[in-house]
């Protein structure tokens, strides 16, 4: 029985260690390398003494953001990822609600204005897995995985809490319903702070597939996106109807 989403990664690493997991522009990362980097980040997070605490991620859609998400999950804490272009005032409102114990961000995004401990993405490569710390982490399926912030009916940030179990059950349902296999090549359109991205990310990891990340800028050129899908042999997309209509027209 799966108790946390990191077990999806562990199982796929055992089967497909050298297979490409994520592709972003000219950058790509294998299952084994991704597991190593996210475990190393988890170890660094654990050095802060955090357990089941909120961690705020302020990063653009990237492989580094995914390492941050899985690193937080592996450490037994839970994350909230937000738009890196969000105005300072709104970020502060989210911080006041979430009360993060740690922020993971990039140095050029100005998050050092917040009086909260930081980990910067350019430090990831310097971290090493600490098996002693990692072995002490205990996660059950009802533990929180992430908090998704929406505008809410009043325009004020509203956090929606999602457990490991919710994502595990959803991922199993998607995999079975759409017969997703390890030979699938998916493309992610939704930002990571939208719940549509959950299908792309965790279904890919669970099934041993490959996920390509496309930026908002790239989606402004439909002809180039279609050519990208052809060139890379994409077999599965999960896009909202408005995007599909946009491409059809």
Predicted segments with their positions:
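Adenylate-forming
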Residues: 60, 108-109, 190-193, 217-218, ...
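Hydrophobic packing residues within well-ordered alpha-helices of enzyme cores
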Residues: 68, 111-113, 174, 198, ...
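Acidic donor-binding helix in nucleotide-sugar-dependent glycosyltransferases
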Residues: 64, 71, 184-185, 200-203, ...
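Carrier-protein-dependent adenylate-forming modules in NRPS/ANL systems
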Residues: 1-165, 178-179, 208
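Active-site beta-alpha turn of Rossmann-fold NAD(P)-dependent dehydrogenases/reductases
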Residues: 59-60, 148-151, 184, 190, ...
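Short hydrophobic "strand-cap" motifs at the C-terminus of beta-strands
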Residues: 25, 82, 147, 189-190, ...
């Amino acid at each position: 029985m799966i108790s946390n989403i990191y077990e999806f990664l562990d199982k796929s690493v055992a089967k497909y260690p050298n297979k490409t997991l994520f592709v972003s522009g000219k950058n790509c990362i294998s299952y084994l390398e991704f597991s190593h980097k996210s475990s190393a980040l988890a170890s660094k997070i654990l050095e802060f003494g955090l357990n089941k605490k909120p961690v705020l991620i302020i990063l653009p859609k990237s492989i580094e953001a995914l390492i941050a998400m899985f690193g937080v999950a592996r450490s037994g804490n839970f994350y909230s990822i937000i738009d890196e272009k969000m105005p300072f005032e709104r970020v502060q409102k989210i911080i006041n609600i979430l009360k993060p114990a740690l922020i993971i961000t990039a140095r050029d995004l100005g998050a050092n204005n917040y009086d909260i401990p930081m980990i910067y993405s350019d430090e990831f490569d310097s971290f090493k897995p600490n098996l002693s710390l990692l072995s002490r982490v205990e996660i059950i399926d009802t533990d929180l995985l992430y908090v998704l912030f929406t505008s809410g009916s009043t325009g004020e940030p509203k956090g929606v809490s999602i457990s490991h179990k919710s994502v595990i059950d959803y991922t199993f349902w998607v995999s079975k319903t759409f017969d997703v296999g390890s030979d699938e090549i998916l493309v992610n359109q939704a930002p990571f702070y939208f719940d549509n991205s959950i299908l792309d990310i965790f279904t890919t990891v669970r099934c041993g597939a490959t996920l390509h990340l496309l930026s908002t800028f790239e989606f402004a050129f439909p002809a180039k996106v279609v050519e990208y899908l052809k060139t890379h042999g994409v077999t599965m997309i999960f896009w909202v109807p408005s995007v599909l209509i946009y491409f059809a027209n």
